[in-house]
Amino acid sequence: MSSVFETLKERGYIAQLTHEEKIKELLEKEKITFYIGFDPTADSLHVGHFLQMMVMAHMQKAGHRPIALIGGGTAMVGDPTGRTDMRKMMTREEIKHNADCFKKQLSKFIEFGEGKAIMVDNADWLLDLNYIEFLRDIGVHFSVNRMLTAECFKSRLERGLSFIEFNYMLMQSYDFLKLYKEYGCIMQLGGDDQWSNILGGIDLIRRKEGKEVYGMTFTLLTTSEGKKMGKTEKGALWLDANKTSPYEFYQYWRNIHDADVIKCLKLLTFVPMEEIEEYAKLKDQEINIAKKRLAFEVTKLIHGEEEALNAQKTAEALFEKGASTDNMPTTEVASGELSNGINIIDLLLKTKLIPSKGEGRRLIEQGGISVNDVRVEGFDRLVTMDDFNNGELIIKKGKKTYHRVKLV
């Protein structure tokens, strides 16, 4: 059985390491505590966090203890990494709510509890810091000249970097020191854009404690063209079903570029490498087999097997010839009726899915009506020709009632 280090390397997670041979030895022979930071600026994790969650899962399965650090304190300041502007400040209540949402989502990948994964919030120690003591004990170890060469600051210098954001590296470094002293945490993991901040923490612990600790960054999730993955027309691809439906989530992965399928199977699923190597041999239309497997596996990880199966069935019913739409109740609509669009409530009445307009409004208010598995958000939703795939669309009422609308 290969070590977790070999697994991470073989599947393509690792971007940079501070001490490759030592880290390899540690992960193979010892059980370590490591941490990954999460920025609580939204009430859901998104695809950008997916890869980090997979790394935590691989590490915990190998016997290592994860710490999920919620940046409640640093979120009140703002990480300049990858940003060209300053962001709004958050309240403690907002941060607490978001952290609770994160823990629920992370629990699908790692196990929390006694002797297992833990979640901490750096607001618990950062908000109580004495500024003079912090400058004297921590700030003294940082060279401004060296900090200014870090990638995370370079892009902001011309546009302007506030002093409050300039402190971010010091605070993240202090987090590592705090977790080292309190939990024996000896490794920080993060996206490759966090490399400078990770090195800052390693250097601080070496200077303050005289101890060697380690850092590892992983590949950022990008397409073969170098663009960030997880962006849709509606914005980020969220892991919360209320923000991105399981069907939309499934379809995103089902429709990714051929060149990205194998990479995503390695990084975002637990499909064994031997199987992935077989998928890599597929050509042309056969690649769709690998895409379906990818879409199913990632949706199962985030939303559970039942939702993944539902999304798969809906996609097949909508887009694959000879699929089960033939057996659905069907209403035929003349294309002329759609020249200016047809109101969703009028269409529901036409299909006899509702007895009255009032019932239609009630269902829409409760989120109970979907068109092609995308929830209808307002009473004024117009159904147009653009909603039809191969001359048909599917309306879903509640969880189990499907109805086909067919163009004639």
UniProtKB/Swiss-Prot annotation:
<feature type="binding site">
    <location>
        <position position="231"/>
    </location>
    <ligand>
        <name>ATP</name>
    </ligand>
</feature>
<dbReference type="GO" id="GO:0005524">
    <property type="term" value="F:ATP binding"/>
</dbReference>
<keyword id="KW-0030">Aminoacyl-tRNA synthetase</keyword>
<keyword id="KW-0067">ATP-binding</keyword>
<dbReference type="GO" id="GO:0005829">
    <property type="term" value="C:cytosol"/>
</dbReference>
<keyword id="KW-0547">Nucleotide-binding</keyword>
<keyword id="KW-0436">Ligase</keyword>
<dbReference type="InterPro" id="IPR036986">
    <property type="entry name" value="S4_RNA-bd_sf"/>
</dbReference>
<comment type="similarity">
    <text>Belongs to the class-I aminoacyl-tRNA synthetase family. TyrS type 1 subfamily.</text>
</comment>
<comment type="subunit">
    <text>Homodimer.</text>
</comment>
<feature type="binding site">
    <location>
        <position position="35"/>
    </location>
    <ligand>
        <name>L-tyrosine</name>
    </ligand>
</feature>
<feature type="short sequence motif" description="'HIGH' region">
    <location>
        <begin position="40"/>
        <end position="49"/>
    </location>
</feature>
<protein>
    <recommendedName>
        <fullName>Tyrosine--tRNA ligase</fullName>
        <ecNumber>6.1.1.1</ecNumber>
    </recommendedName>
</protein>
<dbReference type="Pfam" id="PF00579">
    <property type="entry name" value="tRNA-synt_1b"/>
</dbReference>
<dbReference type="GO" id="GO:0006437">
    <property type="term" value="P:tyrosyl-tRNA aminoacylation"/>
</dbReference>
<feature type="binding site">
    <location>
        <position position="168"/>
    </location>
    <ligand>
        <name>L-tyrosine</name>
    </ligand>
</feature>
<dbReference type="InterPro" id="IPR024107">
    <property type="entry name" value="Tyr-tRNA-ligase_bac_1"/>
</dbReference>
<dbReference type="Pfam" id="PF22421">
    <property type="entry name" value="SYY_C-terminal"/>
</dbReference>
<dbReference type="GO" id="GO:0003723">
    <property type="term" value="F:RNA binding"/>
</dbReference>
<dbReference type="GO" id="GO:0004831">
    <property type="term" value="F:tyrosine-tRNA ligase activity"/>
</dbReference>
<feature type="domain" description="S4 RNA-binding">
    <location>
        <begin position="342"/>
        <end position="407"/>
    </location>
</feature>
<comment type="function">
    <text>Catalyzes the attachment of tyrosine to tRNA(Tyr) in a two-step reaction: tyrosine is first activated by ATP to form Tyr-AMP and then transferred to the acceptor end of tRNA(Tyr).</text>
</comment>
<dbReference type="InterPro" id="IPR054608">
    <property type="entry name" value="SYY-like_C"/>
</dbReference>
<keyword id="KW-0963">Cytoplasm</keyword>
<dbReference type="InterPro" id="IPR001412">
    <property type="entry name" value="aa-tRNA-synth_I_CS"/>
</dbReference>
<keyword id="KW-0648">Protein biosynthesis</keyword>
<keyword id="KW-0694">RNA-binding</keyword>
<dbReference type="InterPro" id="IPR024088">
    <property type="entry name" value="Tyr-tRNA-ligase_bac-type"/>
</dbReference>
<feature type="short sequence motif" description="'KMSKS' region">
    <location>
        <begin position="228"/>
        <end position="232"/>
    </location>
</feature>
<dbReference type="InterPro" id="IPR002305">
    <property type="entry name" value="aa-tRNA-synth_Ic"/>
</dbReference>
<feature type="binding site">
    <location>
        <position position="172"/>
    </location>
    <ligand>
        <name>L-tyrosine</name>
    </ligand>
</feature>
<dbReference type="InterPro" id="IPR014729">
    <property type="entry name" value="Rossmann-like_a/b/a_fold"/>
</dbReference>
<dbReference type="InterPro" id="IPR002307">
    <property type="entry name" value="Tyr-tRNA-ligase"/>
</dbReference>
